[in-house]
């Protein structure tokens, strides 16, 4: 029988671009396609029978931007501009994040890119049972690694989606474990129209409410490159990380040892030992409620997505001031 090919359309070679200094980021926004069944980058240009590029974006716009709480000024120093298949994003050097979309002639968003302004370095995680892993020293979107600094918490993500959601930087720990109506982005409830990958691409700054998975009546376990939860994950065109990085599988978090309630309470997170002596800060940044405009357990609990799908959702690494586990 004839095998049907899966065609995945995308733009550029990564969804996140990080820089620590002022200047102009030049981002490839060539319209590509991939025939890979696992959504990996193949970078095949979309051309017509004459070899001319088709589906090119014609404009760019800033969907949101956020300067970190200890800085002043704008993350972007000027309006991003599209020149052919290059998106030019002027960055001021002020720490923070922005989401820039490229659009077609009708004004529809066809792709988007997370601009992340911060320094960063790599750490080596050594696990005697699971292997050695190279990991960035901070969460995606974080502009600090200092314990108890909200700038260290990073952005929020819905599993399988390529774009971040900004975090309010004025929430302080209180007796309440949930905070209502502080979310900074639009939202919509999943449906046959809304709960699709194509909707998330056109509306990257809209979070989708659901009772379980934002996908409507179906699930796609391979969006972050680990469809069966068993094999080593790969970087997909929906991966939210910078080039050279991808969402980790759960092996990367195995082997951590709970330290103490006092340490977690004092640091709003844990300093987990990653190689026998060196530590990495894991903040208790909380999470966005999947079905409401509600921020839950910020500075009480920490959650880290993995690329591994589960039976009803996806696995995440969970920790608080009492224990740590996978759920």
Regions found by a protein language model. Give the residues of each.
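Short, compositionally biased
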Residues: 2-235, 310-313
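C-terminal, surface-exposed recognition/capping segments
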Residues: 142, 202, 207, 211-327
């Amino acid at each position: 029988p004839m095998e049907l090919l899966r065609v995945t359309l995308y733009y550029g070679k990564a969804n996140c671009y990080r820089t620590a200094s002022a200047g102009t980021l030049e981002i490839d926004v060539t319209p590509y396609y991939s025939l890979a069944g696992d959504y990996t980058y193949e970078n095949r240009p979309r051309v017509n029978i004459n070899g001319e590029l088709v589906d090119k974006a014609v404009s760019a716009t800033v969907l949101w931007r956020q300067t970190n709480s200890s800085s002043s000024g704008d993350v972007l120093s000027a309006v991003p501009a599209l020149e052919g298949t290059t998106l030019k994003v002027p960055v001021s050097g002020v720490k923070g994040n922005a989401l820039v979309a490229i659009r077609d002639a009708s004004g529809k968003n066809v792709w988007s890119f997370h601009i992340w302004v911060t320094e960063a370095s790599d750490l080596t995680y050594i696990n005697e049972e699971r292997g050695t892993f190279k990991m960035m020293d901070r969460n995606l979107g974080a502009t600090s690694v200092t314990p108890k600094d909200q700038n260290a918490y990073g952005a929020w993500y819905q599993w399988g989606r390529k774009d971040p959601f900004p975090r309010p930087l004025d929430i302080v720990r209180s007796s309440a474990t949930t905070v209502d109506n502080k979310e900074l982005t639009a939202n919509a409830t999943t449906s046959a129209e809304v709960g699709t990958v194509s909707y998330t691409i056109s509306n990257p700054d809209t979070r989708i409410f659901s009772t379980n998975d934002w996908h409507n009546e179906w699930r796609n376990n391979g969006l972050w490159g680990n469809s069966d939860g068993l094999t080593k994950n790969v970087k997909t065109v929906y991966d939210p990380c910078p080039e050279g990085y991808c969402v980790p599988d759960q092996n990367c978090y195995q082997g951590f040892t709970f330290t103490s309630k006092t340490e977690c309470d004092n640091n709003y997170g844990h300093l987990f030992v990653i190689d026998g002596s060196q530590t990495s800060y894991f903040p208790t940044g909380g999470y966005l409620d999947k079905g409401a405009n509600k921020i839950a357990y910020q500075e009480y609990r920490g959650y880290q997505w993995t690329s591994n799908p589960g039976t009803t959702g996806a696995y995440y690494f969970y920790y608080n001031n009492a224990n740590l586990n996978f759920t």
